From Swiss-Prot:
GO terms of molecular function: metal ion binding; UDP-3-O-acyl-N-acetylglucosamine deacetylase activity
Entry binding sites for Zn(2+): H77, H236, D240
One of the protein's GO biological processes: lipid A biosynthetic process
Keywords: Hydrolase, Lipid A biosynthesis, Lipid biosynthesis, Lipid metabolism, Metal-binding, Zinc
Record protein name field: UDP-3-O-acyl-N-acetylglucosamine deacetylase
Source lineage: Bacteria, Pseudomonadati, Pseudomonadota, Gammaproteobacteria, Moraxellales
Catalytic residues identified in the record: H263
GO cellular component terms attached to this protein's record: membrane
The protein's Enzyme Commission number: 3.5.1.108
Enzyme class, UniProt record, top EC level: hydrolase
Family annotation (Pfam families): LpxC (PF03331)
Length: 297
């Protein structure tokens, strides 16, 4: 299986979740073995910021990267879509400190990638194959990666709320690009009205609205159109996890499972994997393998 980039650049304008301002985002093809990199176009001589778990400095509400004091935030939804398509090399130019929130899912990014087209490159794609179980725990929350022939995610959340029935709080996802687009990529982020009001009083989540999130009050869902999936809440957590795990810098061959995990714990898990070289190996695979077929467009 070969490395992938885009066939052509593509640009979109969207709202920054926290700033509430318009953000211009350009996805630009990049050479083999350059990886996923971000560039702030609003700052002169800004450094390139790699999509790297070890550059994550802040995980409050999103995954945020920083180099030399220059920050790029809310990267997980875009990275999730890139992981879904197996994009290895891309230069992401952004006109502000955060990636636009779009509709709160990765669906708009899926559309952008399909419009730009996927280019196979003249170098083998590399995967991180998990060799041993690795688990991180914080209180009652945990996240784990273990050996698995493919890529799967099993996630459980725990909310005591009438709008999030208990029988919709766990979801198991067997990765393929088609499965991603149909079942996870369009699951929106969610939040509680009381929290959003508090954040906006502190000049955060200024771009948050019913257009880019599922919002719950004390009684239920405020969005008139309802949910896209019965388990949209936990499916979005899987979307987030796929993006957070892509900060490992490789597509994964392994099984991910989690209970009440979030950006901080997902990041801690990747760092823990790297902590012992015996936890993983970097491999290439044949186009005919089941892992490669999962990325067929």
């Amino acid at each position: 299986m070969k490395q992938r980039t885009l066939k052509q650049p593509i640009t979109v304008v969207g709202i920054g979740l926290h700033s509430g301002q318009d953000v211009t985002l350009t996805l630009q093809p990049s050479e083999v073995n350059t990886g996923i990199r971000f560039l702030r176009t609003d700052i002169e001589d800004a450094p390139l910021i790699a999509a790297d778990a070890f550059l994550v400095t802040d995980t409050v509400m999103s995954s945020n990267l920083m180099v030399n004091g220059i920050k790029i935030g809310t990267v997980e939804h875009l990275l999730s879509a890139l992981a879904g398509f197996g994009i290895d090399n891309l230069l992401i130019k952004v006109s502000d400190a955060e990636i636009p929130i779009m509709d709160g899912s990765a669906a708009n990014y899926v559309t952008l990638l399909l419009e730009a087209g996927i280019e196979e490159q003249a170098a083998p794609k590399q995967f991180m194959k998990i060799l041993k179980p690795v688990k991180v725990v914080e209180g009652d929350k945990w996240a784990q990666l273990e050996p698995y022939d493919g890529f799967s995610l099993d996630f459980e959340i725990d909310f005591n709320h009438p709008g999030i029935p208990k029988d919709t709080q766990r979801y198991r996802f067997e990765f393929s690009l088609h499965n991603y687009i149909e079942n996870v990529g369009n699951a929106r982020t969610f939040g509680f009205m009381r929290d959003i009001e508090h954040l906006q009083k502190n000049n955060l989540a200024l771009g948050g609205s019913l257009d880019n999130a599922i919002v719950l009050d004390d009684n239920g869902i405020m969005n008139k159109e309802g949910l896209r999936h019965q388990e949209e809440f936990v499916r979005h957590k899987i979307l987030d996890a796929i993006g957070d795990l892509y900060l490992a810098k490789y597509s994964l061959i392994g099984g991910f499972s989690a209970y009440k995990s979030g950006h901080a714990l997902n990041n801690k898990l990747i760092r823990e994997v790297y902590n012992d070289p015996n936890n993983f190996e970097i491999v290439t695979i044949y186009d005919t393998s089941s892992v490669a077929r999962a990325y067929e467009i």
